[in-house]
Amino acid sequence: MGPGSQRALFLLLLLLASPGARAFQSCLNKQQLLTTIRQLQQLLKGQETRFTEGIRNMKSRLAALQNTVNKMTPDAPPVSCPALEAPPDGKKFGSKYLVDHEVYFTCNPGFQLVGPSSVVCLANGSWTGEQPRCRDISECSSQPCHNGGTCVEGINHYRCICPPGKTGNRCQHQTQAAAPDGGEAGDPAFSRAPRCAQVEREQHCSCEAGFHLSSTTGGHSVCQDVNECEIYGQKGRPRLCMHACVNTPGSYRCTCPSGYRILADGKSCEDVDECAGPQHMCPRGTTCINTGGGFQCVNPECPEGSGNISYVKTSPFQCERNPCPMDSRPCRHLPKTISFHYLSLPSKLKTPITLFRMATASIPGHPGPNSLRFGIVGGNSRGHFVMQRSDRQTGELILTQTLEGPQTLEVDVDMSEYLERSFQANHVSKVTIFVSRYDF
């Protein structure tokens, strides 16, 4: 039966099912109607067979596809590198061992890092470089004792034996001369007559607060000043003053070094912010940075240009590289931005402590880097710090060794941006740290 006959029979079936079917039936005799019905039944049966065959074929193909998928090699787990341990007498920063993650190392005070300060997990499941170690260093090699003092080596520490007339943990202070006659030892203000009374034929004497009863060579009683500064200055006793204690008749008072003010409690010292006032002492064109007990005048400069590479100062503390020529690959690998940061720290700060954070932010409508790498790339005291990633977009500069001032440290940290493992740009932050002489 051709396509035309099939369409005719289909229309005939519709007519038979319509309300006017009776009028149509009167035009055909019984034999003609039965023949037409049989033809329609055969047509429907053929359509049903082809439909069933199509369903069966589709099921067969799906089953074959499922078998193929089941036989495929399962997805490989993410590549990771072997776990690393902190070196003896050192510390490890970083606990993720996947590709492109970094792990950082530093040593405890008294030890020096030998080897790389950080390693990166490679795509082949190995670390870059060798795992570093910590080597014991001589505490006296830096000649910490001043004024001819003798350095005595200890385990992770040293002590200075000072010559006559010098004192302090590094022999840096002049000893106070003994009080001459008429000084504190002989000053009438530091010794007073006691209050005495006869009680049942016996004499009882007492002293006012801040004095204690003492006997003289003649057997007489006298009230002698209690030197609170000497008593509480002994090792193991709490400090009366944050800085210096001055003994006074019957009491004491606390003083602060230059650049600090005494607080209301009479014991604590607070740094004076010389930069807060409108009339600070920095010349025009410089910026005043407050430090512990003083201030610094700074005016950071951009790197000098070379050839077609140059920088422009966009703010007092930031430089930006001018656009690179299309064919200058070395230019693109130089820092895109250089920023300057200044920190003021007290001596003997407890470590480890985060000092500085470096981060990136994506511009709306522009794809940002999908990988960042942080590191320390310069400075004069790299061994005191470690740069560690804290999250996907942030790196932290961590102080790992205690600092003792006064001293000025510089450390340059770098943030490199990658897009699909292709280098995009890097940014450098130059951090200058002013360490105070004092621990407050």
From Swiss-Prot:
UniProt-listed CDD domains: CCP, EGF_CA
UniProt subcellular location: Secreted, Extracellular space, Extracellular matrix
EGF-like domain mapped to chain residues: 136-172, 225-270, 271-320
Entry-linked Pfam families: EGF, EGF_CA, Fibulin_C, FXa_inhibition, Sushi
GO BP terms in the entry: cell adhesion
Disulfide-bonded cysteines: 81-121, 107-134, 140-151, 145-160, 162-171, 229-245, 241-254, 256-269, 275-288, 282-297, 302-319
Positions of glycan attachment: 124, 308
PROSITE patterns to which the protein is assigned, alphabetical: ASX_HYDROXYL, EGF_1, EGF_2, EGF_3, EGF_CA, SUSHI
Tissue: Highly expressed in newborn incisors and molars. A weaker expression is seen in the brain, kidneys, muscles and bones.
Signal peptide extent: 1-24
Coiled-coil residue spans: 28-73
Keywords, in A-Z order: Calcium, Cell adhesion, Coiled coil, Disulfide bond, EGF-like domain, Extracellular matrix, Glycoprotein, Heparin-binding, Repeat, Secreted, Signal, Sushi
Limits of the Sushi domain: 79-136
Post-translational modification summary for this protein: N-glycosylated.
Gene Ontology molecular functions: calcium ion binding; heparan sulfate proteoglycan binding; heparin binding
Domain of life: Eukaryota
Function: An adhesion molecule that interacts with extracellular matrix molecules in developing teeth and may play important roles in differentiation and maintenance of odontoblasts as well as in dentin formation.
Family membership: Belongs to the fibulin family.
Protein name (Swiss-Prot/TrEMBL): Fibulin-7
Organism of derivation: Mus musculus
